[in-house]
Swiss-Prot record:
The chain crosses the membrane at residues 108-128, 141-160, 168-187, 191-210, 345-363, 370-387, 672-693, 702-717. NCBIfam families: ATPase-IB2_Cd (TIGR01512), ATPase-IB_hvy (TIGR01525), ATPase_P-type (TIGR01494). Belongs to the cation transport ATPase (P-type) (TC 3.A.3) family. Type IB subfamily. It comes from Synechocystis sp. (strain ATCC 27184 / PCC 6803 / Kazusa). It is found in: Cell membrane. The gene is ziaA. This is Zinc-transporting ATPase. Zn(2+) binds at C19, C22.
Length: 721
């Protein structure tokens, strides 16, 4: 059996994607190449992501196809792809109709020929009546034809080039046919007016897209540009990508921290808002970990770099946001497919309107039906939808990132809008996870000191918060030689040999399994039972605190229409009930093993798939549950690679109230996307009907077409604010 070769994903920066059909043109052209599985263009950043089989199609072939379409190409200035060397590409084609600066657009320069055309057109209109059907009519033509060429030269040239390439059914082709058709039926003023309206509208569309692109990119400006590298007693400014692990860097007040590292010298206040969305400053000191993207506010910091820039927290965050568009929502996929078929269908409908009625309706005026067909051609470009829908989703993702919420794709934005059940893990999610030993209860002759010592040493290799709290209460150093045969028993506890004694520390289930008689503790807190050489030694009571915003988080979710809030925990029934009652949860399930949480999630899932379930955990211990939920949400992503890798949505802080905020952003995005779809399709349907029955003019049609595109784009940019 032959095995398929692994697919490769390549990212490229494409210049000149300010036109309404560029996205469809590039995606469609690349996906027709044999071996290309998917091509996805992000209009907002000019980023192209191509997934392909390198055995069937080469990267060179893909680059040549993009260059043949008339776009410039370079490797993206990505936070994670600049590790090492760059391979800039400069594929140019003279005469491409759009600016090639990945969003750079000179409106003043583009407006000059259009304004000249408007002046000439105005003169032609003023003298149209006096000169009509007179020898002086040639003067009218001498003014109006240059006006047509000035306003439409770019459109005509692009349409001609695209026809030679076999690329028809874009807006340039449609406007060329519509205006040449108007000229053919002696509608000169209308032909010029349509081209002028279209060109002015297109210019403002390009300007609006460029502006929204810049506003969205501004959300992602946390990327540090330089690093102050300390080497051989000197400090020099270098690119963060060139700094190596264990290098020393200096961060001055007001500067962004360029790389993740450990503070060796200096104390300061840092602003973490670029990562968390919250501008509350935190204090850092020698020994603390500091992350790229934070802003140093006061002291001078000397930092030892612990990660390359490509592996830093901010690089992963930026890459996640920039690449979120590759995971498209069903709405976005539908619009892309719809746009590919809609334009050809309307073109053929236009042909039918122009040709059939004069053949079958006695006395039908051929020029009148041709005019109606031209109106349909003008309205047949789905520009507003093609740009505004992806722009809306990207704005939602960028706006959420500004508030410390990372959403990995528009498909998860859509899923969040339908969430009706939210399931929380307890420890570290609803509670602080900062455990403290509150009581040591001894049995069978053990002292408190002896029990705490044995427990701390037995737990010395564990990273669980409960183990950390026991070691913190013991407050003495523990040598590795004091502990042997350490074994972690998932969902139960640990076993280790301490001072030649077999120590078991864990929950009720562990002692039941070992058939050791022990107390049944009816207390609100986490109980760690201890047994030494099979003899019960007592238990340690550990308390956890509920997070300050946990109660408000549940209230917000209820207010938003979430029908059920549930907590899953491995803790005892008593502890779970106490937390659930204090917070106001609808239900809880206690004493669960990690694998049992997945079973509980499956029981809560909606069989129809319409009502979505979100699970909120720490992204590390809850990976299987996060993967099984409709929407997996990981909290505390700040500095946690595992959380960023695992979940569909990452909350950079530990605040459960961010869950409601994420759902709010998703619903706002969805609302604006639906508004744009209804607006664009409604206007187009209206003018198709009016055009067919002869109640719409070319002027009105082009005004409606470019107007609705502008409105949809401007509406989409509201999401990011």
């Amino acid at each position: 059996m032959t095995q398929s070769s692994p697919l490769k994903t390549q990212q490229m920066q494409v210049g000149g994607m300010d036109c309404t059909s560029c996205k469809l043109k590039i995606e469609g052209s690349l996906e027709r190449l044999k071996g290309v599985a998917e091509a996805s263009v992000t209009v907002a950043t000019g980023r192209l992501t191509v997934t392909y089989d390198p055995k069937q199609v080469s990267e060179i072939t893909i680059q040549e196809r993009i260059a043949a379409l008339g776009y410039t190409l370079a490797e993206p200035k990505s936070s994670v792809t600049l590790n090492g060397h760059k391979h800039p590409h400069s594929h140019r084609e003279e005469g491409h109709s759009h600016s090639h600066g990945a969003g750079e657009f000179n409106l003043k320069q583009e407006l000059l020929p259009v304004l000249t055309a408007i002046a000439l057109f105005t003169i032609a209109i003023l003298f149209e009546q006096p000169l009509h059907n007179t020898p002086g009519q040639i003067a009218e033509f001498a003014v109006i034809i240059p006006a047509y060429l000035l306003s439409g030269w770019t459109v005509l040239k692009t349409a001609g080039r695209n026809i030679l390439r076999g690329q028809i059914f874009d807006e340039n082709f449609l406007m060329t046919i519509a205006t040449l058709g108007a000229l053919a039926i002696h509608q000169l003023p209308e032909a010029v007016a349509v081209m002028l309206f279209f060109r002015v509208g297109e210019l403002f569309q390009e300007y609006s897209v460029g502006r929204s692109r810049r506003s969205i990119k501004a959300l992602l400006e946390a990327r540090p540009d330089t690093a102050n590298l300390k080497r051989n007693g000197t400090v020099q400014q270098v690119s963060p990508e060139t700094v190596q692990v264990d290098d020393l860097i200096l961060v001055k007040p007001g500067e962004k921290v360029p790389l993740d590292g450990e503070i060796l010298g200096g104390t300061s206040q840092v602003d973490t808002s670029a990562l968390t969305g919250e501008s509350v400053p935190g204090t850092v000191k020698p020994g603390d970990t500091i992350l790229a993207g934070m802003i140093n506010q006061s002291g001078v910091l000397t930092i030892r770099v612990t990660k390359l820039f490509s592996e830093s927290s901010i690089a992963k965050v930026l890459d996640l946001v920039e690449n979120a568009s590759s995971k498209k929502a069903s709405t976005e996929k539908f619009i892309t497919q719809f746009a590919r078929y809609y334009t050809p269908v309307i073109v053929f409908l236009s042909l039918a309107v122009a040709l059939l009625p004069p053949l079958f309706i006695p006395g039908a005026d051929r020029a009148d039906w041709v005019y109606r067909a031209l109106v349909l051609l003008v309205i047949s470009c789905p520009c507003g939808l093609v740009i505004s829908i992806p722009l809306g989703y990207f704005g939602g993702i960028g706006g959420a990132a500004k508030h410390g919420i990372l959403i990995k794709g528009s498909t998860f934005l859509d899923s969040l809008t339908a969430v009706k059940t939210v399931v929380f893990d307890k420890t570290g999610t609803l509670t602080k996870g900062t455990f403290k030993v509150t009581q040591v209860v001894t049995k069978n002759g053990f002292s408190e000191s002896e029990l705490l010592t044995l427990a701390a040493k037995a737990e010395s290799h564990s990273t669980h918060p409960i183990a950390l709290s026991i070691r913190e209460a013991y407050a003495q150093s523990i040598a590795d030689s004091e502990v042997a045969d350490y074994e972690e028993i998932a969902g139960h506890g640990i076993r280790a040999v301490v001072q030649n004694q077999v120590v078991i520390a864990g929950n009720d289930r562990l002692l039941h399994r070992e058939k050791i008689d022990h107390d049944t503790c009816d207390v609100a807190g986490t109980v760690v039972h201890l047994a030494v050489d099979g003899r019960y030694g007592g238990y340690i009571l550990i308390a956890d605190e509920i997070k300050e915003d946990a109660v408000q988080a549940i209230r917000d979710l209820k207010r938003m229409g979430v029908e059920k809030t549930v907590m899953l925990t491995g803790d005892s029934e008593i502890v779970a009930q106490s937390v659930a009652q204090q917070i106001g949860l609808d239900a809880f399930v206690a004493e669960l093993l990690p694998e049992e949480k997945v079973d509980e999630i499956e029981q809560l899932l909606d069989p129809s798939g319409k009502a979505k379930l979100a699970f909120v955990g720490d992204g590390i211990n809850d990976a299987p549950v996060i993967a099984r939920a409709d929407v997996g949400i990981a909290m505390g992503g700040l500095g946690s690679d595992a959380a960023i890798e695992t979940a569909d949505v990452v909350l950079m802080t530990d605040a459960p109230s961010k869950v409601a905020e994420a759902i709010h952003v998703a619903r706002k995005t969805r609302q604006i996307v639906v508004q744009n779809i209804v607006l664009a399709l409604g206007i187009k349907a209206l003018f198709i009907a009016l055009g067919t029955i002869g109640l719409a003019t070319l002027w009105e049609a082009v005004f409606a077409d470019v107007g609705v595109a502008l409105l949809a784009i401007l509406n989409a940019t509201r999401i990011a604010k």
